[in-house]
């Protein structure tokens, strides 16, 4: 057990063999890792065969930011508990939204790898953020624009495409 004031550290091992020492609270943002810690499977490090070191470092950066922002917000709320200002959300909420927006300004391959990692590690906030980013990339675009954005080849014949448009006319209105 970690001594008073000392933070317990967890070792995460990426698919390419790199090891990351992270605070237990940060690692527990992942429900997958949380269950491993709760089941006492974290003593020799936690192998993450589906996440490479580049993506794992980004995931840790996200979890770190969110854990410390939540702690700061809780601390601020405790300080303000006696005053009417307690009902007002801490200013860090807007800062965190801006940080999140900057965090997902990455190339498509990294974004998709972050989605896969967030899903595998069961980090709801990160999965929601990354999926919403992809949804925003699609919103308001024609099928042709979406194909171009994501480099998707159109393998429909003109006849098949027309049939799909006819069957799904409601979606194109």
Curated annotation (Swiss-Prot):
CDD domains named among the record's database cross-references: BTB_POZ_SKP1
Interaction with the F-box domain of F-box proteins: annotated span: 115-173
Keywords from the named record: Host-virus interaction, Nucleus, Ubl conjugation pathway
Single GO BP term: SCF-dependent proteasomal ubiquitin-dependent protein catabolic process
CC terms in the record's Gene Ontology section: cytoplasm; nucleus
Stored InterPro entries: SKP1, SKP1-like, SKP1-like_dim_sf, SKP1/BTB/POZ_sf, Skp1_comp_dimer, Skp1_comp_POZ
UniProt pathway annotation: Protein modification; protein ubiquitination
GO MF annotation terms: cullin family protein binding
Cellular localisation: Nucleus
SMART domains per UniProt: Skp1 (SM00512)
Main location: nucleus
Family, per entry: Belongs to the SKP1 family.
Summary of the function given for this chain in its UniProt record: Involved in ubiquitination and subsequent proteasomal degradation of target proteins. Together with CUL1, a RING-box and a F-box protein, it forms a SCF E3 ubiquitin ligase complex. The functional specificity of this complex depends on the type of F-box protein. In the SCF complex, it serves as an adapter that links the F-box protein to CUL1.
Subunit structure: Part of a SCF (SKP1-CUL1-F-box protein) E3 ubiquitin-protein ligase complex. Interacts directly with MOF (via F-box domain). Interacts with rice black streaked dwarf virus RBSDV protein P7-2. Is able to form the SCF complex together with CUL1 and the viral P7-2 protein. Interacts with D3.
PANTHER family linked: SKP1
Name of the protein in its database record: SKP1-like protein 1
Organism of provenance: Oryza sativa subsp. japonica
Name of encoding gene: SKP1
């Amino acid at each position: 057990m970690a001594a008073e004031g000392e933070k317990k550290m967890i070792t995460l091992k990426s698919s390419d063999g790199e090891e990351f020492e992270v605070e237990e609270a940060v690692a527990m943002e992942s429900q997958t890792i949380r269950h491993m810690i709760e089941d006492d499977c974290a003593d020799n490090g936690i192998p993450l065969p589906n996440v490479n070191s580049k993506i794992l470092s980004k995931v840790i950066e996200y979890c770190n930011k969110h854990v410390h922002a939540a702690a700061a917000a809780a601390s601020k709320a405790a300080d303000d508990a006696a005053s009417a200002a307690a009902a007002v959300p801490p200013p860090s909420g807007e800062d965190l939204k801006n940080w999140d927006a900057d965090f997902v300004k990455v190339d498509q391959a990294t974004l998709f790898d972050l989605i896969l990692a967030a899903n595998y590690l069961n980090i709801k906030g990160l999965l929601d953020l990354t999926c919403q980013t992809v949804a925003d990339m699609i919103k308001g675009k024609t099928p042709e624009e979406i194909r171009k954005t994501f480099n998707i080849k159109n393998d429909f014949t003109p006849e098949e495409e027309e049939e799909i448009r006819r069957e799904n006319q409601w979606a194109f209105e």
